[in-house]
């Protein structure tokens, strides 16, 4: 007896591409006053990252959750749609074939949720089973895959779609705590 199978994988990234050390030097160094910060950013061994932010000005005013979330939702919908359509095409499926839709994020949320919005946009079935894993942090991606595995173990003839949408640069914080420096370097 075989278990669930991964049929495809797809990604979509924001168009703005920044070098890791540029993010430190131009975006964050005015707000993170620590000699260790540059070394932490270099040690992360990330060369480039994509961001919904074209430049650092957004972060200067320490924007609140609403401003950050508005940017998240504006970018999440088209990028998620692109990734989903690519994944479905690679798998030889259409949106109506999806039985379980699991959306994961710790960098944005809305009500109605991205799961409901995308299901409507993509014409998914009205009896679609949805799960939104919001605010769980780094392990949510694995939790989403686990949820899909559990659903498919119970219903092997079904198809599950797991979507993770994360825009970490939206949440850079001012301050020189070790936690803030590591989070800025990694996410």
Give each language-model segment a name.
Residues 1, 74, 80-96, 106-187:
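Acyl-thioester C-C bond-transforming condensing/cleaving domain
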Residues 1-99:
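Conserved active-site "lid/cap" helical segment
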């Amino acid at each position: 007896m075989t278990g669930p199978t991964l049929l495809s994988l797809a990604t979509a990234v924001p168009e703005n591409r920044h070098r890791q050390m540029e993010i430190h030097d131009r975006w964050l160094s005015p707000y993170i006053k620590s000699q260790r910060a540059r070394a932490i950013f270099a040690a992360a061994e990330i060369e480039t990252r994509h961001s919904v932010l074209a430049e650092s000005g957004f972060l200067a005013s320490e924007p609140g959750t609403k401003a950050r979330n508005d940017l998240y939702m504006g970018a999440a919908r088209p990028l998620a749609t692109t990734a989903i359509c690519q994944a479905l095409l690679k798998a030889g499926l259409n949106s109506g074939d999806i039985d379980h839709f699991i959306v994961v994020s710790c960098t944005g949320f809305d009500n109605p949720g991205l799961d409901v919005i995308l299901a409507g946009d993509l014409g998914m079935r009205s009896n679609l089973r949805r799960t939104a894993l919001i605010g769980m942090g780094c392990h949510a991606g694995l939790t989403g895959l686990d949820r899909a595995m559990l659903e498919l173990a119970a219903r092997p003839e079904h198809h599950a779609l797991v979507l993770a949408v994360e825009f970490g640069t939206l949440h850079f914080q001012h301050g020189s705590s070790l936690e803030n420096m590591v989070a800025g370097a990694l996410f």
